[in-house]
Amino acid sequence: MSVEATDPDFKRAIELIDAGDCVALAKMLDAHPRLLVDRVPVADDAAGAYFANPKLIWFVAENPVRNGTLPDNIANVVIAIIEAARKHAVAELKADLDYTLALVASGRVARETGAQEPLIQVLTGA
C-alpha cells in the first residue's frame, strides 16, 4: 500500500524511521518539533480511514503495510520519538501512544518480524 507523504520533512522523517536511524531522527525532531504533533499530509487516502491523516509515530507499526519489514531497532526508534515528544511537551502523547499500540497489536509485520512484543513493551511502558 502506498502512503506517500507530501511534506518533505515528514517524508524524510518516515525514511529515517524505516532506516532505523535513531540519531538522525532525534536531530530532525529536535529541529522540527511540529513533526511530533502535526498530521502527515498524504497524497491520497489509499490507506483507509484508520490511517487517514496519520501521526508520524504511527509509521513505526508498519500497519498498513508499506515496506513489509521493520528495522531491527524499531523499539529504539519509538524510544527516540517518545523522548523527543516529552522534550517538546507534546500534549497528546498518551493518545498517540495508545493509537500506535493498537496499530502494532493488530499489524502482521510487527508480529512476523518479532518486533511486536518489544514495541508493545515500549509503548505500554512509556
Give residue ranges: language-model regions.
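Short coil/turn connectors between adjacent alpha-helices in alpha-solenoid helical repeat scaffolds
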Residues: 23, 61-75, 105-125
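Ankyrin repeat domain, specifically the short helix-to-loop turn at the C-terminus of the second helix
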Residues: 27-38, 73-88, 120-126
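Ankyrin-repeat boundary/"N-cap" motif
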Residues: 4-15, 38-66, 89-114
